[in-house]
Amino acid sequence: LSIGFFLSSPIHAEAIDCSAPGHSLQKVCSASFSKQRDHLDNLYLTSLLVTDAPSRIIKDTQLMWVQRLKQCKSIDCIKQQIDLRADELNIFVSLNQSLTQHYLKFERGAFAQQQVHMKVHQLSKDRIKIEAVAYRNPNNRLDAQSIAFLAYTTPNQKTEVTDNEHDCKYQFNYSKAILSVKTVQKGCERFAGIYRLYD
């Protein structure tokens, strides 16, 4: 009986919840975006079922994305945000995440106002790639909506990291489920802060 229940129960996950009355995503929930919502719902569900990344990182990056989506003031902004989220979900589905540690920046127990998603990839026994995206206002021009971080290092030197994108030097302090990132350089503070590990 229990096996039959699981086989007959459809699994459904919505990328955008349009069921709540008076919600702040009315434009996105309009009929004109139904195809994009369906596509995003399918990608979201697929990423939850297929990826080897922790499902919590997919759910929390989804919550962060919805926060950015709510800031959109134009149809173009909404379209861009949907496309960007589809790209992010495709990465979760298509790339091996088993050797990747995901971190989100937190402040006072919640997502940081300046949202940052950092990934630490173990490329080989002696090579680590660290990449991050700091999200900015989604109403900015597409090329000004985020700031990238990219660094390559080794396991022995993963506490002293230089961002190749902006030549910023950081001190990384890893402790269990927390990553503390510090810098003394002016203009490099965007990626400094406390990050929570998703595993």
Residue ranges and their predicted role:
Residues 1-6:
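Bacterial N-terminal signal peptides
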Residues 17-59:
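Amphipathic, heptad-repeat alpha-helical segments
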Residues 9-14:
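Sec/Tat signal peptide C-region and signal peptidase I cleavage site
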Residues 59, 67-69, 134-176:
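Contiguous, well-ordered beta-strand patches that form the walls/edges
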Residues 55-58, 89-104, 118-124:
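N-terminal helix-cap/turn-to-beta initiation motif at the start of protein domains
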Residues 21, 94-117, 195-198:
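Tryptophan-anchored aromatic micro-motifs
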Residues 142-157, 183-199:
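Edge beta-strand at a domain terminus
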